[in-house]
Design a protein with these regions (language model features):
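HhH-family (HhH-GPD) DNA N-glycosylase catalytic core used in base-excision repair
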Residues: 1-215
Length: 215
């Protein structure tokens, strides 16, 4: 789940990740990545889209667990778990708390426009923890993110100082990795699990949304 992709009229998608903007389109079973090169494909996009993992095998395995999972696997066979930049995943899921997708995307866009590096005219990378650690919650007022501003600043300061070590969460015991992320003000179990799954590819993480609980 990423908030920096926009669908175009022709069905292609424009997105920014790891400081690069690309256009992605699907033609049959072929995936085309435009505005890129072979080096970036090998070092960024192959990993980002998790292209080397056999999702067909995973669908087969989960289909045997429960009929509901079998139907879910059939419903959206093309879904892949994106390997996003960990700090960006952390911040965007902090922003996602008690929020809707349209508003989340707007806040993330304003965050990048105000504090991210311009990588091409009108396009901005996600701001670094170093940049955000220099700011105050009041500096984030243009984002219109409300109470989340102080959570974002706390996250930036703790990541930049090393108090929270995102990279260590790749190899820590799952529960310990969760606890590491929950040192950040405003990060509970769900945001920690989303960060672990989408930012650190800890596939044992299973974020449970409020709508799943209500169902």
């Amino acid at each position: 789940q990423s908030f920096r992709w926009k669908e175009n009229a022709d069905g292609s998608f424009d997105g920014i990740a790891f400081g690069k903007k690309v256009r992605v389109r699907l033609d049959g079973e072929r995936l085309y990545i435009e505005n890129s090169n072979k080096a970036d494909f090998e070092s960024i996009w192959k990993d980002y889209f998790d292209l080397e993992l056999d999702y067909g095998k995973i669908r087969e395995e989960i289909s045997e667990i429960h009929p509901v999972l079998k139907e879910a696997a059939k419903y959206a066979p093309g879904i892949r778990i994106l390997r996003q930049e960990p700090y960006e995943a952390l911040c965007t899921f902090i922003i996602s708390q008690n929020n809707n997708i349209k508003r989340i995307k707007g806040i993330v866009q304003r965050l990048c426009e105000n504090f991210g590096e311009e990588i091409s005219p009108g396009d901005f990378a996600f701001p670094t923890p170093q940049k955000m650690a220099e700011l105050s919650a009041d500096d984030l007022a243009p984002l219109r993110a409300g109470f989340r501003n102080r959570y974002l600043i706390d996250a930036a300061q703790k990541v930049y100082s090393g108090e929270v070590d995102l990279e260590s969460c790749r190899t820590l015991d799952y529960e310990q990795a969760r606890k590491e992320l929950m040192k950040i003000t405003g990060v509970g179990v769900k945001v920690a699990d989303c960060t672990l799954l989408f930012g650190l590819h800890r596939i044992e993480a299973f974020p449970v949304d409020v709508w799943m609980k209500r169902a």
